[in-house]
């Protein structure tokens, strides 16, 4: 209803749902096109038949498709945001938005017709659509589609992949797999020693020395791009010490999406790199630590939020888009993301807590698969907040590593590790309470934590 869509292409599993929707008076849906049906049926077109009809029209000299005039400033795609802290908004992007971003990426990322890109994330997500799919077409490279998250390493080998753009959790899993194999082979200590010896050497030299590890990934990888969430700087550094070129990129649906990206020549650990050529960035409302909200402008910035004037006015001010992300920018122009403005926890003493930063530390605890940092009100004073964490753990790993069997033993073992995390931070940041579960956190399709949904679930269970 919100998109006012008139036609939908769909696969068989959605047929019953879409048939019901079509006859709902609250929408403008006119056409259903099935990927699976071989023939047109009552009220439903077959994609197969539409292609045949189109071929006939072209043979008969029809040039409507080729001669169609495109207004590159008008909306050509609408995308629903993931809504990690609130309900989703409909982002309106134009041809100009997408194409300018493609050209920006192409000018800084070294990909050519000899490359093979592995597509993993859903293509309805703008990061995968632009970086993992359209960018490949634009550069004449080949795109291969993954068999699923569990098969990424196999796919890297099978398809001799050279470039992959994905989310941090995949790179963390791959790194964990490499480490386990080296431990099993009794080679880990030697590898770690050699990493330090080669710390000041070139990426090529490291690649030659760690050929065995590169072969685990197919032997052809020249670039890993991490996006959609923050990559743990420690993981990023370890990849690069092994001669694996991994960089971080940053963007949002509203920016088509790439705002900034690191390259092999211009790169700093923990940074999302510098802005792409046609995008400008600055900080507003900067605090004493040099952290402010990142605002950006350029031809890839969205037209606004479809049918939502209020939200558009809040985020799009003049030429600038207010990202809602807090960041630092150093003297050389490298951008460092600190966290989401809406997810920052403000304590009674006025100090700011960035949940993402603390979650990275908790996630390093052996047996912890993911975590969610939140503020818990301690009294009637709504500003009296203490830091708590919801920890998702791997039962088998925890039982083996900590020799803990009962819930009480598991809680005690993990909270001892939480105390170790606390000892590395100022006292005001200390985690005071913990919830344990084996149930995964609520996340978006690109593995971002849906903060409000998880907080609602915690509040519901406590009430």
Regions from the PLM with identified roles:
Residues 301, 315-316, 334-363, 396-409, ...:
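Adenylate-forming
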Residues 1-52, 377, 385, 395:
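Structural core segment of the AMP-binding/adenylate-forming
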Residues 99-116, 123-211, 220, 245:
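Conserved AMP-binding/adenylation subdomain of ANL enzymes
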């Amino acid at each position: 209803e919100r998109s006012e869509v008139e036609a939908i292409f769909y696969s068989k599993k959605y047929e019953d749902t879409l048939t019901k929707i079509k006859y709902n008076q609250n929408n403008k849906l006119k056409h259903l096109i099935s990927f699976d049906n071989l023939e047109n049926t009552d009220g439903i077109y077959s994609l197969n038949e539409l292609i045949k009809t189109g071929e006939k029209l072209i043979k008969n000299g029809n040039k409507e498709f080729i001669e169609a005039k495109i207004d590159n400033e008008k909306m050509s795609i609408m995308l629903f945001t993931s809504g990690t802290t609130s309900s989703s908004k409909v982002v309106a992007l134009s041809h100009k938005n997408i194409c300018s971003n493609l050209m920006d990426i192409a000018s800084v990322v070294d990909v050519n017709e000899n490359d093979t890109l592995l597509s993993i994330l859903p293509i309805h997500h703008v990061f995968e659509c632009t970086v993992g799919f359209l960018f490949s077409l634009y550069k004449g490279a080949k795109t291969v589609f993954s068999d699923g998250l569990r098969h990424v390493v196999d796919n890297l080998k099978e398809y001799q992949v050279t470039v992959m753009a994905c989310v941090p959790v995949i790179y963390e899993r791959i790194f964990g797999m490499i480490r386990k194999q080296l431990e099993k082979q009794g080679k880990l200590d030697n590898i770690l020693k050699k990493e330090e010896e080669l710390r000041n050497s070139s990426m090529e030299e490291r690649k030659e020395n760690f050929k065995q590890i590169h072969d685990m990934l197919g032997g052809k990888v020249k670039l890993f791009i991490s996006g959609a969430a923050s990559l743990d700087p420690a993981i990023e550094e370890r990849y690069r010490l092994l001669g694996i070129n991994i960089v971080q990129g940053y963007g949002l649906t509203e920016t088509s999406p790439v705002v900034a990206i690191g390259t092999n020549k211009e790169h700093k650990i923990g940074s999302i790199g510098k802005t792409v050529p046609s995008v400008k960035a600055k900080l507003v409302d900067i605090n004493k630590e040099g952290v402010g909200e990142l605002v950006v402008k350029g031809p890839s910035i969205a037209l606004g939020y479809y049918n939502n004037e209020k939200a558009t006015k809040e985020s799009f001010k003049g030429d600038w888009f207010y990202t809602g992300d807090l960041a630092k920018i150093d003297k050389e122009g490298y951008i460092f993301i600190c966290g989401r403005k809406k997810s920052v926890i403000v304590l009674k003493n006025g100090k700011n807590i960035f949940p993402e930063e603390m979650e990275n530390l908790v996630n390093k605890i052996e047996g912890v698969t993911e975590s969610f940092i939140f503020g818990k009100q301690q009294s009637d004073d709504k500003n009296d907040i203490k830091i708590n964490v919801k920890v998702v753990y791997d039962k088998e790993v925890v039982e083996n590593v900590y020799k803990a069997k009962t819930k009480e033993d598991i809680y005690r073992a993990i909270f001892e590790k939480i105390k170790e995390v606390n000892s590395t931070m100022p006292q005001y940041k200390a985690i005071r309470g913990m919830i344990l579960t084996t149930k995964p956190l609520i996340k978006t399709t690109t593995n971002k934590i849906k903060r409000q949904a998880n907080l609602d679930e915690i509040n519901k269970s406590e009430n």
